[in-house]
Design a protein with these regions (language model features):
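Soluble accessory domains appended to multi-pass membrane transport proteins
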Residues: 30-125, 140
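Single conserved hydrophobic/aromatic residue that forms the stacking wall/gate
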Residues: 1-8, 12-13
Length: 187
């Protein structure tokens, strides 16, 4: 009776161990057949973002932005959510820029559109979008959306941050900063 229980327990342990491997193997087949991503694509899954370095039968190998190597089981990739940032030829870049209350919005919009027009990596179709996004506690937020080729995304994103900061300063468009008013109690 005890030996039968031991054999049964051993079989359960083996089944559990094999089920993970079989799930990863099946996931690998699904990934290889459906091709939701390919080597060189930038993907995100399970909170990890990286460039696909290699697709193997049991796992996919990613290289992160800081050059870490991550092995993700294909079972998890085939049954979970995968965001592929490289799949489409274009991507939309978005910025939310806070300016001071009292700034002339027409001037802010015109300056922003001029900055966008000067960057040849930004596509004209679909047309860039600039609008007043929100009236926050200490800033008037402007939203900017523009389409770029996928490979230009990060370059445009960071370059525009620098350009907007520089040009807005030259144009006298102020950026807000949080302020705290302290009232001193009288004794």
């Amino acid at each position: 009776e005890i030996s039968a229980c031991l054999v049964g327990s051993e079989m359960c342990i083996r089944d559990r161990a094999l089920s993970g491997n079989l799930q990863n193997f099946a996931g690998g087949l699904i990934v290889l057949l459906l091709r939701p991503y390919k080597v060189g694509d930038l993907i995100e899954s399970q909170g990890i973002t990286g460039t696909v370095r290699e697709i193997q039968i049991f796992h996919t190998i990613l290289t992160t932005g800081d050059n870490k190597i991550i092995y993700i089981p294909n079972g998890a990739l085939s049954s979970g959510t995968v965001t592929n940032y490289s799949r489409e030829a274009t991507r939309r870049v978005e910025w939310i820029i806070g300016v001071e209350y009292g700034e002339n919005f027409d001037k802010v919009e015109e300056t922003t559109r001029r900055i966008i027009a000067e960057d040849k990596r930004i596509l004209s179709d679909p047309a860039p979008f600039v609008a007043l996004h929100a009236l926050d506690a200490s800033s008037v937020n402007v939203i900017i959306r523009a389409w770029v080729k996928s490979e230009d995304y990060w370059g445009v994103y960071f370059d525009m941050n620098k350009t907007i900061y520089s040009v807005f300063n030259k144009e006298g468009i102020g950026f807000p900063f949080p302020q705290l008013t302290v009232h001193q109690a009288k004794d």
